[in-house]
Amino acid sequence: MSQTIYFGTYTKKESKGIYKAQFDPETGTLSQLELVAAEPNPTYIAFSEKGNLYSVGAEEGKGGIASFTADFQPLNHVVEEGAPLCYVSVDDKRQLVYGANYHKGQVLVYQLEADGRLSFVDQDTHQGSGP
């Protein structure tokens, strides 16, 4: 029995964003590839319990998080200057979305609004270096 999977991509060449496909675990094949959301370099994605989609996103050369409805309509982008985020996670219990920016050493926190949009809440920046 096939499973529906979603995945983000790098979009420098032919790819256009976030895709859906059918995965057959018996054969290891993908079929019925479909673009569900156009977004620059959505390399990490996460879904909320309501089905809203959150992805690493970009807008006008800035990096951040993009939000989409359960049927993949764009809601909003929350972005800032500099390198794009590389990780996004949804905390449905606390109604928060977390993003990580390895280049800046940051963890960013966003509030999940009732309609699925995001608003920036806080950030923590790591100071220092490795061992």
Question: At which residue positions do the language-model features occur?
Answer:
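Structural motif
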Residues: E14-Y19, K62-A66, Q106-Y110
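Blade-edge beta-strand/turn elements of extracellular beta-propeller
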Residues: P25-L35, D71-H77, L118
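Asp-box/WD-like beta-propeller blade repeats and closely related beta-sheet repeat scaffolds
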Residues: F72-P131
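Conserved beta-strand positions in repeat-built beta-propeller and related beta-rich domains
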Residues: F7-T11, S55-E59, G99-H103
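WD40 beta-propeller blade-start loop/N-cap
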Residues: A37-A38, E80
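Beta-rich catalytic cores
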Residues: E14, P40-T43, P84-C86
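Residue-level detector of Asp-centered blade-edge/turn motifs that repeat once per structural unit
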Residues: M1, F47-K50, V90-R94
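An edge-strand/N-cap motif at the start of beta-rich repeat modules
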Residues: M1-K13, G17-Q22
